[in-house]
Amino acid sequence: MKNSFILLVLIVLFSCQNAIPKHETVNNVFKSDILKVIDEVSKLEHLIKLNTSIGQLQQQFLKAHSSYKQVETISEYYFPAVSKAINGPALAEFEENDGKTLPPEGFQVIEEFIFPTYNPKSKAELLKEIGILSANLKRLDKVSQTNELTDSHVFDAMRLEVFRIITLGITGFDSPIAQKSIPEAASALESIEKYYKIYADNSTDESFQKVLKTIKKGKEYLKTNTNFNAFDRAFFIREIANPLSIGLHKTQVSLKIPFIKETRGLKTTAQTLFDKNAFDAEAFSAFPDYETTPEKIELGKLLFNDPVLSGDNSRSCASCHHSDKAFTDGLEKSISLDGKSLVKRNTPTLTHIAFQRVFFSDSRVNYLEDQAVAVIINENEMHGSLAKSVVALKKEASYVAKFQKAFPKTAIDEFGIKNALASYIRSLSTYDSKFDGFMQGEEKFDLDEIAGFNLFTGKAKCATCHFIPLTNGTVPPSFMKSESEVLGVPDKYKKLDADLGKFELTKAEIHRNSFKTPTIRNVELTAPYMHNGVFKTLEEVIDFYNDGGGNGLGFNLQNQTLPEDKLNLTDLEKKQLIAFMKTLTDKKYY
């Protein structure tokens, strides 16, 4: 009996020592699922070669794309470049390093061949795209073989996948034509479920079971409510996605799995996308010494309102950025410094602009500090000089004291001026609107506001460019890139606006008439709209998008990135959309 007990103990100890780490089990599941995607794409290729019916092709495409959703959690996390080649937008990409324009590839390109119908004459081109996709999937398989996971990264990836489902999945971002993103989101949830069960390890613990029940509820809701336009995204996010990401966060804490120590736009410790402090403005700045402090904010506010920064002491930043108008001026275009002509573009809001990777409508600078300098030295705007401002400020005892508090290690200098201004602008991102409160479970929406949110993230396709929750063009869930779009904005004479936008910077044809996607936080206060201020009301803006942008107006732009198909919004839906957009107003403006 004694010997038997000793033998049992030895067996248990041996088993524990040789147990496969959970993150390795996750990796094995991931690598196995990659092979399934490769197989499904191979079947699609075979059906194309056999000249199979459109219905069968579409069905197999959806099966293949859904199988990719089973690997997306880990693929997007560890291999973003390969993942983009597999499932990125069907838009050409400009490489800033070498000035080359790369054609799109992957599932979304193939989707355009097969949906809404398939033309057999494009068979050769379609097979070519299938071949490219297959090669990229094999590349994913190859790089995954030597990749090592950790428990911390697995949990980080699972939460990010929930955020990806919210922002890119149920909004239709990666199924723009077939509009099958709702059932495909269920496939993405299934991958989270598989990985989570490995950590739950058949545990009957109530907290583990609660997460699994939430996933089950989510899958059932996604599979039974597949109509893209009718899907209640507000309910799904508040009742399923948010509780799920919170549950994953709590499990990570309970298992004592460390959170990733990394400075990111979306904090690695965020429980949901909509936490009050989910985003880190410092992650969007250049260096640690750019860090925002209360002293810098106070100094920056003084400088912002002081004409000392302009060449003739006649205007300040606040001259064109009025705090009561969410830091716009209500004009189509501001008056130039000469008092006669107009500046080139409409004055944008400064609220909530900190969470972007580029600034100005043409994306010409990367940091708020550089934006401040560009405005100060622009001869039409302030025509100032930081060097001269330093001299002037050193003569003011009050400024000397303020700078000493904000920058105790240095005297007044050019860096201090621009960093203080940028720090003040960063402080203008409050994220305390009714929308934020609604997503945090602290506010209630009326029926029109809920309908408007569901339109914004669904039928109206607003959220495929104005990504929630920031509502700008900074792409979630990594928030590493801010996008520009070609909309075909008209001038006041109903012709294509002559402003070439980002093209002036890159000289790339895909950027002709391209402009950065701005935030629409406080949008009810920031009229007139667009880079040229051509639209006076939100109703006019919605009509423009509803008609298909510039091409809907007959401009025939070859590089328009906005879908030119009409949205067919009803008058009621337009009103509901505006009702939602008004919930994006900061609390101080209520």
Model-identified regions with their sequence ranges:
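Sec-exported extracytoplasmic/periplasmic mature domains
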Residues: 42, 46-49, 62-76, 115, ...
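Extracellular low-complexity, Gly/Ser/Thr-rich intrinsically disordered linkers
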Residues: 537-548, 556-586
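Post-cleavage N-terminal segment of exported redox proteins
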Residues: 16-21, 218-296, 383, 387, ...
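Short glycine/threonine-rich turn/loop motifs
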Residues: 266-374, 437-535, 540-543, 549-556
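Mature extracytoplasmic or organellar-lumen-exposed domains after removal of signal/transit peptides
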Residues: 20-278
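Extracytoplasmic redox metalloprotein regions
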Residues: 87-148, 152-156, 302, 306-310, ...
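Hydrophobic, well-ordered secondary-structure elements that form the walls
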Residues: 20, 520, 533, 577-580
